Regions:
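Outer-membrane beta-barrel translocator domains and adjoining extracellular loop/strand segments
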Residues: 46-51, 101-106, 222-228
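Conserved small-residue
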Residues: 62, 81-188, 230, 239-267
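Transmembrane beta-strands of outer-membrane beta-barrel pores
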Residues: 37-43, 78-80, 93-99, 204-206, ...
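Conserved small/polar residues in nucleotide/adenosyl-binding loops
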Residues: 277-280
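Membrane-embedded beta-barrel scaffold of Gram-negative outer-membrane proteins
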Residues: 12-56, 87, 94, 98
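Transmembrane beta-strands of outer-membrane beta-barrel proteins
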Residues: 21, 33, 87-89, 198, ...
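Active-site beta-strand/loop architecture of penicillin-binding DD-peptidases
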Residues: 40-42, 51-62, 182-184, 188-194, ...
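Outer-membrane beta-barrel signature, preferentially recognizing the C-terminal barrel domain
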Residues: 1-32, 59-82, 125-128, 189-194
Length: 280
């Protein structure tokens, strides 16, 4: 047995200051409206801080963060009654904006979970995805040869070590003509911009029927499983996207799906935007 997380005897409680303003009113015994606005600031927030690997741990929990949340919530409910029949409906929508205010003097922190790197940065939401950005696939050997041109100003695409035709290209974020970890950038967040829901309930005497729907919009989901099933490796199953894979220069597919292969080459197995799903 061994501890999975480093202990910290100096940990304390998080502190939150919050202001909430609300408005609620009804009309004709049929309609009910609710509107809430809130702002909160959490200090001494518990965050996992990277530590030297010789400690035996990658991170240690510390009270160093300050984060603000601001948002609005709205709901509308209706009640209709005709004799023994009652029909109730409710719709709600909310939006929250999260921002890191302070990290104990640091500007940013990186943490990695299940091969996905997250960046927590002052002025940004907590836990943005921090990945490479795919830029289609190399259509032919000529594009790869061009990416190796000694005159980097002539390169159409950045150099990817070990890449073959049909392998992923990536955007050269730092502009040095080569793809490496310095080309990672913020590529989205798991927190939705909007959360909404709708429910309806119908009652007649002792019978009732209820339906409830919920959804989110504007967030991204990292699907690590795609790293294997969308990598077109021979030892794994594939999704229907495989039909759009690169086959040859004359049959490039959609230009977004890598070639079929026995073992990934280039940086096809690297965590990138190809693993991120965007909600509608």
């Amino acid at each position: 047995l061994y501890p999975s997380t480093a202990g910290n005897p100096d940990l304390g409680w998080e502190k939150t200051a919050m202001l909430n303003l609300g408005l609620e009113f009804g009309l004709f015994n049929m309609f009910t409206f609710e509107l809430d606005w809130y702002t909160s600031t959490t200090s001494d927030m518990l965050l996992d801080v990277p530590v030297a690997e010789f400690s035996g741990f990658s991170t240690i929990p510390m009270n160093i963060g300050k984060v603000s949340n601001k948002g609005i919530e709205f709901s509308l409910a209706t009640t209709n009654k005709w004799g023994d029949f009652t029909w109730n409906n409710r719709f709600n929508i909310s939006a929250n904006r999260n921002e890191v205010v302070d990290l104990g003097g640091a500007e940013e922190m990186l943490t990695t979970t299940e091969s996905v790197t997250f960046i927590t940065k002052v002025g940004e939401p907590i836990g943005n995805y921090y990945t490479l950005v795919t830029d289609g696939v190399f259509a032919n050997q000529a594009e790869i040869d061009n990416s190796k041109d000694p005159d980097k100003t002539k390169r159409k695409y950045a150099y990817v070590e070990g890449a073959k035709p049909g392998d992923f290209r990536y955007k050269d974020i730092d502009g040095n003509g080569e793809i490496n970890e310095n080309d990672r950038t913020i590529t989205g967040n798991y927190m939705p911009k909007f959360t909404y829901g709708f429910s309806t309930e119908m009652k007649y005497k002792n019978l009732d029927l209820a339906v409830s729907l919920q959804g989110v919009q504007g967030n991204k989901i990292a699907n690590i499983f795609r790293r294997y099933i969308d990598n077109m490796e021979g030892g794994n199953n594939c999704q229907i996207d495989a039909l759009d894979r690169w086959v040859s220069e004359d049959d490039p597919g959609s230009g977004l799906v890598v070639r079929a292969n026995r073992s990934a080459t280039g940086m096809n197995g690297t965590t990138s935007t190809c693993l991120l799903y965007t909600s509608p």
